[in-house]
Curated annotation (Swiss-Prot):
It comes from Roseobacter denitrificans (strain ATCC 33942 / OCh 114). Residues 249-436 form the GATase cobBQ-type domain. HAMAP family: CobQ. The gene is cobQ. This is Cobyric acid synthase. It comes from the Bacteria. Gene3D superfamilies: 3.40.50.880, P-loop containing nucleotide triphosphate hydrolases (3.40.50.300).
Amino acid sequence: MGRAIMLQGTGSDVGKSLLVAGLCRAAKRRGISVAPFKPQNMSNNAAATTNGGEIGRAQALQAFACGLDPTVDMNPILLKPETETGSQVIVQGQRMTSVAAGDYAKLKPTLLGPVLDSFNRLKAQYDLIIVEGAGSPAEVNLRSNDIANMGFAEAAQVPVLLCGDINRGGVIAQVVGTQAVISPADAGMIKGFLINKFRGDPKLFDEGYEIIKNHTGWPGFGVLPWFTDAWKLPAEDAYDIKTPPRKGGLHIVCLHLSRIANFDDMDPLSHEPGVQMTMLRAGEVLPADADIVILPGSKSTRGDLAFLRAQGWDIDLAAHLRRGGHVLGLCGGYQMLGQSIADPDGIEGPPGTTEGLGFLDITTVMTPQKRVARITAKHAQSGAMFPAYEIHVGRTDGPDCARPFAYVHGQPDGAISQNAQVTGTYLHGMFTDDAFRAQWLAQFDVTQNASYTATVETTLDALATHLEAHADVDGILALAR
């Protein structure tokens, strides 16, 4: 059986996901058989596994850092928010139910079993498991039946490293305060701390570092400077999306929907020197110089269509098309482009039918069956083959489907308008393929100059080197039990 170490944070967005990816790559470079694990994640940015399940995309990146294909055991519980107060519950890759936030607490006691089953399977396969917590163990109001932080660490007997974020300020209180509010037993599970996101000269924090050690009795494992290349890796949270400031070239605008999903579809495009990528947020007007507008995936398609209209983006899109611009809809965004979206069974919310944007002559009916698959598709226009994945509910039909975007196992996918300005597809991840991305950009007279997979590989290596330069990586890995 393998050993394990768990990285928990003093709060959300302290950099846990990135640090786990970096530690995974550092362990792999040491010749260690390593895998990532996150008991519970909350994200609409999901990845498809080879066996038809879905997990958080952060765990897929961590698996990539280990040189592994992602499996459902790496993230056995995935919560996908559908509304402000409810989420879809994915257990070991498959949809279990949808629950309101208050009801999830009642469900949690039944989920520790599957979590431990997945964890133990990984331990039997690999020498080292690097576990990522969620949120913070200082949220002691959630400690009862916890499966994400100390509840899991206690059940699985995994030692913990606590990470604080100095960039947001108050990191001494973050770390010392965490020890103050958790139980002595939980505090005993924590074997040290790490400070992340320091800007400037880390030596300026020497005194603060010693204060934390003296107050907690925990050893420190380093002060990590801000990792400037983090934007080159897929973001887990939509609000963490960073695009390089770039003027000129092909201007692609992505609508930042309220329940945006699989937004990392845009990452490979944003890396291209010949592309200016803009994430359009609530209250902003679609730029008149936009060449292509992307409607991304959504966890609540009808709800996000209402959100889109509330921003006036439906009017902006119509004007954009009149100017000769192009529109690409991905998954939920594809469904929005049609004449109507019917949800008779209330799969994504209250039952009913919503009028679509009407830019494609198609209609969509939501169905209970969810399709999750990693596939190889054939581009209808060029015949080029490319890898992609699907995560969606719904069936789409209509006259414009006679002009498909691609073929999957010989079956048509997507639709293209008669004037070829509007395209929709259920496929995700297609732009990660360098050859296909080059071909797609060429139709807009843009030369592809970046290798996305190579960029991610290089950045993960740089991240591991960054950790090795500023943290006691060998000491951290030696904590594993």
